[in-house]
């Protein structure tokens, strides 16, 4: 089942509460308005430099289990976005080009 706006907002709330990201960006079919009944949600979670990607991803999957829809998460740092964001071969490029920012931490 394709998630509603309320469910996406709940996803964002849970991610923010769990790992305190710098940004959360929705990308993929949901960001393009093309999500179907079987679509998952693709989110890029921008974390501070020095973050352990694997630990953060594992923790998020544990925290987000049971949402009722699929979530694909990409964990990235600002330095990685700056370095690879313009490279067409990286998912970062697509996320930055077509994505919608759902959350930005206060500066």
Language-model segments: residues:
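Catalytic core of pol beta-like nucleotidyltransferases
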Residues: 1-23, 32-37, 48-107
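Structural signature of the urease/amidohydrolase superfamily beta/alpha-barrel
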Residues: 40-42
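Short hydrophobic/aromatic beta-strand micro-patches
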Residues: 44-46
């Amino acid at each position: 089942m394709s998630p509603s706006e309320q469910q996406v907002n709940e996803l964002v709330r849970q991610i923010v509460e769990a790992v305190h990201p710098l940004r959360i960006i929705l990308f993929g079919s949901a960001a393009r308005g093309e999500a179907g009944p079987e679509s998952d949600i693709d989110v890029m979670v921008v974390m501070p430099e020095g973050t352990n990607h694997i630990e953060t991803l594992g923790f998020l999957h544990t925290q987000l289990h049971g949402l009722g829809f699929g979530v694909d998460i990409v964990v990235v740092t600002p330095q990685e976005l700056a370095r690879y964001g313009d490279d067409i071969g990286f998912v970062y490029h697509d996320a930055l080009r077509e994505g919608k920012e759902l959350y930005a931490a206060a500066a």
